[in-house]
């Protein structure tokens, strides 16, 4: 797995673990902040019409223990079977069941083009437990970045601009 390093300034080194969040959580490490996207239904082999994804979320959220008590979850609702599966609502419910509260919402607009099969935006949900500290509580709510990179053949990967903004704010 790839581990990325970047420097905020000359006095502090920040490490970004660019890997499966479950892998990171299994290690005995301290981490300040979580920025991740839970796997989609199909990545887990889950039927979206069942409650299995919510059960996965409950078991996963309970493992998050960032030292700054902030976690940002990026998720896109899914279109299928002639309906929209509201994954962002399920994420909010799972965090609230685990004692977190929704602190901030952002929307990443991926494109203004019409797409009959995919949502053209992503919900970026920041959750908190007290005490917590946010560097910029007045960050913009809507971010437009149409330059999604292609990662391992998957062309709807996270925007580096959005990731940078979230990390720098928290």
How does the language model describe each region?
Residues 1-170:
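Core catalytic lobe of class I
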């Amino acid at each position: 797995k790839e581990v990325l390093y970047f420097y905020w300034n000359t006095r502090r080194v920040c490490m970004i673990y660019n890997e499966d969040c479950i892998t990171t959580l299994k290690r005995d490490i301290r981490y300040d902040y979580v920025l991740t996207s839970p796997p989609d239904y199909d990545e887990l082999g889950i039927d979206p019409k069942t409650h299995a994804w919510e059960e996965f979320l409950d078991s996963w959220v309970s493992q998050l223990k960032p030292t700054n008590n902030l976690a940002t979850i990026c998720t896109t609702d899914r279109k299928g079977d002639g309906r929209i599966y509201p994954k962002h609502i399920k994420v909010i419910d799972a965090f609230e069941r685990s004692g977190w509260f929704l602190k901030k919402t952002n929307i990443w607009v991926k494109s203004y083009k019409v797409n009959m099969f995919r949502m053209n935006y992503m919900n970026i949900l920041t959750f908190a437990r007290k005490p917590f500290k946010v560097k910029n509580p007045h960050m913009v709510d809507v971010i437009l970045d149409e330059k999604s990179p292609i990662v391992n053949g998957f062309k709807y990967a996270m925007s580096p601009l959005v990731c940078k903004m979230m990390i720098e704010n928290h």
